[in-house]
From Swiss-Prot:
Main location: membrane
GO cellular component assignments: T cell receptor complex
Cited function: J region of the variable domain of T cell receptor (TR) beta chain that participates in the antigen recognition. Alpha-beta T cell receptors are antigen specific receptors which are essential to the immune response and are present on the cell surface of T lymphocytes. Recognize peptide-major histocompatibility (MH) (pMH) complexes that are displayed by antigen presenting cells (APC), a prerequisite for efficient T cell adaptive immunity against pathogens.
Keyword terms: Adaptive immunity, Cell membrane, Immunity, Membrane, Receptor, T cell receptor
Single Gene Ontology BP annotation: adaptive immune response
Compartment annotation: Cell membrane
Protein name: T cell receptor beta joining 1-5
Length: 16
């Protein structure tokens, strides 16, 4: 995914 995704551990996956 190329959208920021928020996870329960407080981290986020963004465009890399």
């Amino acid at each position: 995914s190329n959208q920021p995704q928020h996870f329960g551990d407080g981290t986020r996956l963004s465009i890399l």
